[in-house]
A protein has these predicted regions:
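Residues within well-formed alpha-helices
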Residues: 18, 52-55, 77, 90, ...
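Conserved short-loop catalytic and cofactor-binding motifs
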Residues: 3, 41, 79, 112-115
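Alpha/beta catalytic cores of group-transfer enzymes, especially the acyltransferase/condensing modules
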Residues: 21-25, 83-124
Length: 124
């Protein structure tokens, strides 16, 4: 996840390396060669998704000229950074705080999520 960007773009490498410092752990190790179990931890998943989305947008440079941006939940942070309303660093710090808080909540009250596809409303 994101390894190709890291290897092919100097800006991506700089941002990924900066993310390792901001997060306090080597997210690149997990994103590029970690286990699914490591990546499924919300304290890793959320920064990884944010990082991949934002790095991709920022590496597009001047090619990325959106008329508008939108995001839902975690995607709101990516949208704000991609549209230069929020800095990469501040966006990642916010996502880190959010992710660690949600990780703690998950540990205090374990739960799970399921997707239900192709069933009639009455069946669900």
């Amino acid at each position: 996840m994101g390894k190709e960007l890291y290897e092919q773009h100097a800006l991506a490498k700089r941002l990924f390396d900066e993310a390792n410092e901001i997060l306090g752990f080597r997210i690149t190790d997990i994103m590029f060669s970690g286990t699914d179990e490591d990546l499924k931890q919300t304290k890793v998943t959320q920064p990884a998704i944010f990082l991949h989305s934002v790095v991709h947008a920022l590496c597009m440079g001047d090619e990325f000229q959106p008329d508008m941006v939108a995001g839902h939940s975690l995607g709101e942070f990516s949208a704000l950074v991609a549209n230069k309303v929020l800095s990469f660093q501040d966006g990642l710090r916010l996502v880190k705080t959010r992710a660690f808080a949600m990780q703690k909540a998950c540990e205090l009250r374990p739960s799970t999520m399921a997707a239900i596809l192709n069933l009639e409303d009455a069946v669900v």
